[in-house]
Amino acid sequence: MESQRNILLIGLLFVSFLLWQQWQADKAPKPVATESSVVANATTNHSADVPEADTGVPAAVAATQNLITVKTDQLDVQINPVGGDIVYAALVSHKLEQGKDQPFVLLEQTKDFTYIAQSGLIGRDGIDSSAKGRAIFAASKTEFTLADGQDSLEVPLTYVAENGVTYTKVFVFHRGKFNVNIDYKINNTSAAPLQVQMYGQIKQTIKPSESSMMMPTYRGAAFSTASVRYEKYNFEDMGKNNLNQPTIGGWAAMLQHYFVSAWIPPATDSNTIFSSVSAGGLANIGFRGAVYDVAPGATQEISSQFYVGPKDQKALSALSDTLNLVVDYGFLWWLAVPIHWLLMFYQSFVGNWGVAIILITLTVRGLLFPLTKAQYTSMAKMRNLQPKLQDLKERFGDDRQKMGQAMMELYKKEKVNPMGGCLPILLQMPIFIALYWVLLESFELRHAPFMLWIHDLSVQDPYYILPLLMGVSMFIMQKMQPIAPTMDPMQVKMMQWMPVIFTVFFLWFPSGLVLYWLVGNIVAIIQQKIIYAGLEKKGLN
């Protein structure tokens, strides 16, 4: 009995430590004040717009152009003709606030904050590494819209160099998707060979993550190579060391809570994943592709993909078999993945994420019921042994070795395992932690309502009703479990305070997680009633 209570206390401390540790690990450095260009008129920037190529000259001259607007069923995008950068991206189907029409803006460029996606051609003859500045593309119109019945939308931009070479940059948007194809077509009509190299990078003002101890979230970069499936690269590390990792395939991304932007070059191409931080506090991460030689009279096509949207594991996996890892479940990912799958499965039937969480709770409690029954049976047997254990303590006094041997012989004789009731508690803790990360990381739960006052399962209960009910349920459970007479008085006081401690902790937890714990406690109370009734019939009162 005492060992089980100790394990419960240790479990609480362990969960608290994990949350505190994750919060410390994901804290970003303080933001650096910067001045960036206003979106109303797009401008090219200094040489930081273009990464270092194998050969090439940094860009220098700035220019101003009107933006090109692209609207699909999922995205509202603005493209700067200077370089063809995506300087604004709003997610039409994801709102900034629940119940309001304003879309969530992921990419933007304002006076105080920059978060944009850049791409271009560098190298010896790259149009974006010229000393005159980046290429200024021309478009047939400034507004493009995905029409009804249209599955894809092409936005072609054209640039004719001084030597007569035509460069076409085509953005291809898709219905129902957040990924954009960026295709370059180089028609070398000159008499000299060309050498170019495509790059794609994401530029963001260094900004701390909006997280708390109970809801830690990560804001920063991440990348994948052939040798490293997934690795976070926070802003602080980016400021200390620049990435320069050759790889086949790979990807580079910027992450924040629920959303991601990522460059995904072709999986079979030779690329280099790079990063840098400019003096103005702008963090860059991206890729440089292979160097292409374009002979006179030849045509060369170079492609890549860019994703800007929610952390949708299915959509991300379709682009790269490791991109779905940006949904980071931590060290218990192997347990969180099936929990997420089961959550999605239940929701597809009931159409309510709160009900799906309740069904997961019933599933977990049902699977653990045989162990729970064994736990309470073991506890009852241990209570019946208390007089004999007390007799052993009086007989052997301070001789702990002999008393320990006598206790083990007694347990063996009575067929009692003193640790037999601990397994359900040990199993519940990793399930609790895994579900915590599922509820924290799964974008599907963002703005997902349950019923009554719970309008968003991904945030804390606005009225703290669920945490208080959870505390009451813990108090009832505690009263149903008799306290061993041999238990230390200090431990008794600590256990009496456990419902209060848990309630305080859960005040700031996502309401979906509190719902899971509350329903679990209610089911546990019912199970205890059933088990105790069976034990009384067997005389294990």
Curated annotation (Swiss-Prot):
It is found in: Cell inner membrane. GO terms for biological process: protein insertion into membrane; protein transport. Its main location: membrane. One of its GO terms (cellular component) is plasma membrane. Keywords: Cell inner membrane, Cell membrane, Chaperone, Membrane, Protein transport, Transmembrane, Transmembrane helix, Transport. GO terms for molecular function: membrane insertase activity. It is a multi-pass membrane protein. The keyword Acetylation does not apply. Signal peptide: none annotated. The keyword Acyltransferase does not apply. The chain crosses the membrane at residues 6-26, 325-345, 349-369, 420-440, 457-477, 500-520. Required for the insertion and/or proper folding and/or complex formation of integral membrane proteins into the membrane. Involved in integration of membrane proteins that insert both dependently and independently of the Sec translocase complex, as well as at least some lipoproteins. Aids folding of multispanning membrane proteins. Belongs to the OXA1/ALB3/YidC family. Type 1 subfamily. Interacts with the Sec translocase complex via SecD. Specifically interacts with transmembrane segments of nascent integral membrane proteins during membrane integration. This is Membrane protein insertase YidC. It comes from Shewanella oneidensis (strain ATCC 700550 / JCM 31522 / CIP 106686 / LMG 19005 / NCIMB 14063 / MR-1).
